């Protein structure tokens, strides 16, 4: 089979959302929640022709009688049976393709355990019978989507954040820093501070409302303390939000207090460094000769970097940390929510990439460990 003639499939599996589509496209065709729902009680719903499992939005809309599970926790796959269900749903329901006819590019988080990489490879070749596959690091793909091969990426999604220094297309393993603070933690914090204001959000449906408030109304303050004073002395920063039942609530300083936790994890009672310090610490672990290329190419990626004001604040914080002669540049592309997927789409459609795929023949000869040889991704 001539691989060039067939469009490759690109799947970016995140802790919260799965993004999937075809290489060469400029956006994913399918974006759905990475959840698997299974009936809580057998027999009760048989009359309605109930299925054994539901994926994504289908699972969400039936959550009343399903047990919902996220197979990816903090960026790492923890349940392979459920993960397989999500991939099956992606191929057959979302994209309407036969996986045995398309090469598949999957994404992984930095420092993904070796056995996980092997398991992904095994499932693609043995369960889905793909003709070829490849596994690429999410942050490296984000960098590609910005048209660069050297830079530092702060990738922050729903489950986990990483600072990854990349030189000429290869991640520098010793400089990868992980931060277990991301979108889910910000939503929990928003719920906590709104509860203190007297609003109550407890059910799963209400948690979705919190997420919506966070995504629509939050922003990052350039100067947090000054913004707190402004919020205390006037109502200019207040916004109204209409709940599904028609009730209108007011959101004030919560708008910027919520994402402030990215810069001040102590607000969540966490002792870790903020995202700005994490970027700085990653750069400082790199060779002194390449630091200026990293400071000059700071790429923000992932849904939890979508807050208005985040790039200006990052510039201010890094300028304060870096040597005074260093030129700082923050790149925050408007489509950065999907930049990992877009980078995968670009990579998989390059003619120079076609020899990089792991073929079915190579897999049959070497087994799952072939993934470490063919998809090294790291600078040796």
From Swiss-Prot:
One term under GO cellular component: cytoplasm
PROSITE patterns the record matches: ACTINS_1, ACTINS_2, ACTINS_ACT_LIKE
Keyword Hydrolase: yes
Keywords recorded for this protein, A-Z: ATP-binding, Cytoplasm, Cytoskeleton, Hydrolase, Nucleotide-binding
Top EC class of this enzyme: hydrolase
EC number assigned by the record: 3.6.4.-
Catalysis: reaction(s): ATP + H2O = ADP + phosphate + H(+)
Cross-referenced InterPro entries: Actin (IPR004000), Actin/actin-like_CS (IPR020902), Actin_CS (IPR004001), ATPase_NBD (IPR043129)
Entries under CDD domains matching the protein: ASKHA_NBD_actin
Gene Ontology molecular-function annotations: ATP binding; hydrolase activity; myosin binding; structural constituent of cytoskeleton
Subcellular location: Cytoplasm, Cytoskeleton
Gene3D superfamilies xref list: 3.30.420.40, Actin, Chain A, domain 4
Entries under Pfam families matching the protein: Actin (PF00022)
Domain of life according to the entry: Eukaryota
GO biological process: phagocytosis
Major location category of this protein: cytoplasm
Its job: Actins are highly conserved proteins that are involved in various types of cell motility and are ubiquitously expressed in all eukaryotic cells. Multiple isoforms are involved in various cellular functions such as cytoskeleton structure, cell mobility, chromosome movement and muscle contraction.
Protein family: Belongs to the actin family.
Name of the protein in question: Actin-18
Organism: Dictyostelium discoideum (Social amoeba)
Encoding gene (name): act18
């Amino acid at each position: 089979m001539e691989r060039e003639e067939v469009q490759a499939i690109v799947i970016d599996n995140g802790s919260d959302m799965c993004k999937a589509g075809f290489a060469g496209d400029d956006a994913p065709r399918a974006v759905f929640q990475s959840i698997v729902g299974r009936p809580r009680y057998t027999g009760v719903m048989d009359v309605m022709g109930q299925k054994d499992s539901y994926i994504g939005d289908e699972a969400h809309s039936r959550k009343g009688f399903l047990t919902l599970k996220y197979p990816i926790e903090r960026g790492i796959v923890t349940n392979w049976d459920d993960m397989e269900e999500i991939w099956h749903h992606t191929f057959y329901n979302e994209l309407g393709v036969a996986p045995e006819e398309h090469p598949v590019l999957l994404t992984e988080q930095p420092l993904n355990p070796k056995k996980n990489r092997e398991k992904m490879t095994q499932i693609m070749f043995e369960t889905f019978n793909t003709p070829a596959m490849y596994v690429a690091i999410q942050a490296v793909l984000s960098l590609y989507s910005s048209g660069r091969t050297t830079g530092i990426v702060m990738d922050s999604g729903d489950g986990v954040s990483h600072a990854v220094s990349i030189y000429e297309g290869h991640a520098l393993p010793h400089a990868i820093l992980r931060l277990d603070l991301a979108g889910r933690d910000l939503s929990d914090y928003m719920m906590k501070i709104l509860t203190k204001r007297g609003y109550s959000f407890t059910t799963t449906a209400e948690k979705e409302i919190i997420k919506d408030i966070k995504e629509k109304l939050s922003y990052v303050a350039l100067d947090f303390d000054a913004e707190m004073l402004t919020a205390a002395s006037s109502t200019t920063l207040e916004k109204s939000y209409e709940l599904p039942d028609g009730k209108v609530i007011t959101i004030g300083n919560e708008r910027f207090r919520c994402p402030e936790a990215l810069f001040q994890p102590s607000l969540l009672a966490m002792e870790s460094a903020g995202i700005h310090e994490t970027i700085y610490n990653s750069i400082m672990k790199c060779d002194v000769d390449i630091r200026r290329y990293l400071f000059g190419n700071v790429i923000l990626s992932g849904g939890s970097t979508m807050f208005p004001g985040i790039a200006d604040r990052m510039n201010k914080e890094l300028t304060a940390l870096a040597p005074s002669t260093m030129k700082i540049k923050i790149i925050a592309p408007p489509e950065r929510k999907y930049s990992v997927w877009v980078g995968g789409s670009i990579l998989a459609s390059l003619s120079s990439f076609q020899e990089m795929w792991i073929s079915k023949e190579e897999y049959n000869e070497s087994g799952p460990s072939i993934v470490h040889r063919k998809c090294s991704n790291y600078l040796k």
